[in-house]
């Protein structure tokens, strides 16, 4: 959350509401026109700049990290191909990811509770366990969607709807903020207004398939940042974003199976 503030304070404060002025067809690409972005933690960041960022993101340290990350992903992909029965890991690692990703949102269950519920050992799982199980269902709903259509805003809605067990709606009411819920101190207020948020989501989706010649892992990070900054839904944005990361890696053929346990690292390195 603080990263949103730190990366945005370089622009000057401006209270004019942003509007998408037009879509321009340039070389068969949709280009969204936005005014100069400005930021204040006290007002909705309706002027959130679309991707790509103006700053250079593929720095030497980033590129070195990408080489290492891709080597590890290739090893994981090969290991999955060599396992005679991949279901051994596809039935366990996504559940561990579901538990850890839910824990990031303070939805806490144990591996034992989760596996017992997944295998129908317990008649009535706890509410937290049910939520973690829905994360697993949302991941598989996203995979199913990916087999029918490319990654998109629609994918995000399918994933979030499965997570919440109710249709996910783009926020139309004000009041969402990132910060301290007790003191009400705000670090970041995401864009507000359904049309404004939908405009940001449309630009986010366009960037997925734009040719900006950035590495697929860098693109994943940028897309994740932008999705969380848009914060399009009333609930489930963080978990939805983490599932979209895995789906992006599969779409880019850096993974074959959803067996990347990223949330466990996040929980262990807060």
Predicted segment positions?
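FIC/Doc superfamily catalytic core
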Residues: 1-270
């Amino acid at each position: 959350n603080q990263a949103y503030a730190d990366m945005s304070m370089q622009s000057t404060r401006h209270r004019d509401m942003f509007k998408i002025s037009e879509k321009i067809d340039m070389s068969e690409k949709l280009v969204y026109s936005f005014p100069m972005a400005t930021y204040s933690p006290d007002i909705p960041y309706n002027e959130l700049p679309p991707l790509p960022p103006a700053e250079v993101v593929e720095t030497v340290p980033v590129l070195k990290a990408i080489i290492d990350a891709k080597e590890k992903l290739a090893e994981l992909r090969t290991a999955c191909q060599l396992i005679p029965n991949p279901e051994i890991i596809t039935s366990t690692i996504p559940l561990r990811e579901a538990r850890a990703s839910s824990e990031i949102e303070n939805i806490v269950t144990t591996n034992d509770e989760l596996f017992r519920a997944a295998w129908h050992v317990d008649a009535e799982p706890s509410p937290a366990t049910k939520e973690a199980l829905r994360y697993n269902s949302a991941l598989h709903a996203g995979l199913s969607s990916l087999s029918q259509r490319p990654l998109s805003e629609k994918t995000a809605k399918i994933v979030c709807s499965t997570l919440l067990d109710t249709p996910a709606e783009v926020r139309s009411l004000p009041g969402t903020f990132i910060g301290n819920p007790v003191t009400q101190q705000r670090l970041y207020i995401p864009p507000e207004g359904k049309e404004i948020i939908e405009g940001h989501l449309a630009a986010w989706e366009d960037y997925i398939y734009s040719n900006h010649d950035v590495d697929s892992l860098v693109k994943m990070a940028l897309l994740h940042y932008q999705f969380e900054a848009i914060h399009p839904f009333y609930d489930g944005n963080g978990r939805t974003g983490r599932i979209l990361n895995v789906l992006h890696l599969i779409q880019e053929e850096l993974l074959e199976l959803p067996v990347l346990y990223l949330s466990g690292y996040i929980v262990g390195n807060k």
